[in-house]
Amino acid sequence: MRALRAGLTLALGAGLGAAAEHWRRREGKAPGLLGRVPLLPVVAADLPALPGGPAGGTGELAKYGLPGVAQLRSRESYVLSYDPRTRGALWVLEQLRPERLRGDGDRSACDFREDDSVHAYHRATNADYRGSGFDRGHLAAAANHRWSQRAMDDTFYLSNVAPQVPHLNQNAWNNLERYSRSLTRTYQNVYVCTGPLFLPRTEADGKSYVKYQVIGKNHVAVPTHFFKVLILEAAGGQIELRSYVMPNAPVDETIPLERFLVPIESIERASGLLFVPNILARAGNLKAITAGSK
């Protein structure tokens, strides 16, 4: 318990702390991982409001409720922040330990299912994926949570899924997931934050556009890329950071994974999340691993 609190606090920031506390008060208690995690990733839009503003303050402005707040979901095996616009997660956070990779969790007993905690207007369904040509790609991988059937079942909520090109899902991305699990043999704790990216492309007119496909009647957004950030606790207190980006396209699985390492700043800029300031605030020894580094 103490290690979980310390590690997740190392990795992640306080920006959503208020939202998490609101969620706890509303529910009376927080089930699953969220009940043990005090601080979550920072999204710029969720940072505390600046002082000032209209007379009467936010209390009067919120008389009829706010149209939306951070949608946190806590499961047995992970925590996610949900984006109702894309019908998917902004990020999913999980902790990998050797004992959690073993157990009675049986994938054949799992079924993909809607997340009933998400409003019907804003959630994906299995019908959205049917005939789309995309896999239902896990963000928190099922194989990461064999330690209980419930933990594995929770990875099959469609809120933990994104449309993924089958060749990527079954090959290069799967290799990255397997590599992440293998690091539990070397590091004391492995924290994994995974999410979608929607990156701009420069077109023939010289202008840059963010364009992405949507699938199904619920218009589930198809990411252009995916990121995975690994926060690794080594012996002696050193924290290592490895950050990867892969395109949502067929990728040659023989390409070494280190070719997909990117500076963490590029993920922070593209995703709107912040990792490094929060790690540095709690750890004096951070080593960022990038392509070609030793």
From Swiss-Prot:
MF (Gene Ontology): DNA endonuclease activity; magnesium ion binding; nucleic acid binding; protein homodimerization activity
Cell compartments where the protein resides: Mitochondrion
CC terms in the record's Gene Ontology section: mitochondrion; perikaryon; perinuclear region of cytoplasm
Modified residues (Phosphothreonine): T125
Record has Cytoplasm as a keyword: no
Family: Belongs to the DNA/RNA non-specific endonuclease family.
Presequence boundaries: 1-44
InterPro entries for this protein: DNA/RNA_endonuclease_AS, DNA/RNA_non-sp_Endonuclease_sf, Endo_G_ENPP1-like_dom, ENPP1-3/EXOG-like_nuc-like, His-Me_finger_sf, Non-specific_endonuclease
Requisite cofactors: Mg(2+)
Name of the protein this chain belongs to: Endonuclease G, mitochondrial
Single GO biological process annotation from the record: cellular response to glucose stimulus
Keywords: Disulfide bond, Endonuclease, Hydrolase, Magnesium, Metal-binding, Mitochondrion, Nuclease, Phosphoprotein, Transit peptide
Presence of keyword Calcium: no
Oligomeric and partner information: Homodimer; disulfide-linked. Homodimerization is essential for its activity. Interacts with YWHAG.
Domain of life: Eukaryota
Site keyed Essential for catalytic activity: positions: R107
Modifications after synthesis and translation: GSK3-beta-mediated phosphorylation at Thr-125 is necessary for its interaction with YWHAG and the induction of autophagy.
EC assignment: 3.1.30.-
Species this protein is from: Mus musculus
Active site: H138 (proton acceptor)
Function: Endonuclease that preferentially catalyzes the cleavage of double-stranded 5-hydroxymethylcytosine (5hmC)-modified DNA. The 5hmC-modified nucleotide does not increase the binding affinity, but instead increases the efficiency of cutting and specifies the site of cleavage for the modified DNAs. Shows significantly higher affinity for four-stranded Holliday junction over duplex and single-stranded DNAs. Promotes conservative recombination when the DNA is 5hmC-modified.
Region (Essential for deoxyribonuclease activity): 283-293
